[in-house]
Amino acid sequence: MRKWYEMEACNQGPIIGGQVYLVRNIMGYPFEAKMNEEEQKALMAAVCYAVRQSEEVLQKKFVFINFSEVRDYEQQALTGKLAIPPQMFEKGHEAGILISEDESISVLVNGKEHLCIQVSCPGNHIQEAMALAGQVDDCLNQYLKYAFSKKYGYLTSSPLYMGTGMSASYLLHLPYLEKKSVMHQIEKQISQYGFTLRPHFDGQTEAPGSVYRMRNRKTLGLSESEITSALEHLAGQLAEQEEALARQCFNEDRLCQVDPMYRAYGLIKYARKLGYDETMACLSLLHAGDLYHIWPEQAEICPFAVMLNMADAVLSASAEKNISSSERGRARADYIRRNLPVLDASEAVSS
């Protein structure tokens, strides 16, 4: 089954995809910081039961992963592939996660709060993600009684999620704005509207892959629709600015834009050993080439999916052991050679 981040919509614009998070605590249990192991296990069993009972309605099958039974790199791989919201995960708890087969829905149990429902969507479809998250929320609420106050909304241990208990974010690919050295200025402007804009991936460069995450900072006093509408508006403005800059650069010197894209393709397609940051830089160029129709139409290049799957922890998880830096370099090159299509030069878009 194709994962949500492998869908074509992830490559059709500066907005790669979106995620909605609903944070919930369950009546009858103390907050996570005060729970003992028995309570955490009981809560996990209750949530697993609720999810299993909801599979038919949601038309999704879920896999359960208990973090006490997996290695660190396997848990890190789930975080790297966006199944686990890193801001909600806290190591050391009796925690687990239920993930749908396409990885579009995950339910984190015993993170920093009792529950975090996460729904991911490709492209600019945050409203659809919000609707699906609401459906999951309603299904689970039939079996779990949420801690809720008429005055404060959903009760959480962190004031960040008090109110709707909802957070939403978009992943954006912004290489042309980045080249213009305006990202810090944009981050300040975005913060005035109650949102953050930060590099998504960790690496030695400032923003590996030129991928950024825009997220709301607060939920109290705001409705879910207000949060998602503001996010859509701000992300849409950034996407328009990115596309306008790209068009300007292509109109001024198309060859100057296209040549590095083909060089990047050749490097990572045929290399035998690849470092993380250099690969991210090349994949960013491939993503821009896909977005601006450089590659043949039948060439299925999914740069964002490759970004996720060639991360260190994901490569270790695929090898089923914690591999060395040198082994990761070889494994990364092997993975990319297998998953990037061979381009027919006769079908390539003319520069």
Residues of each region from the PLM?
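Long, Pro/Ser/Thr-rich low-complexity/intrinsically disordered regulatory tracts in eukaryotic proteins
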Residues: M1-K151, M166, K180, H184-E187, ...
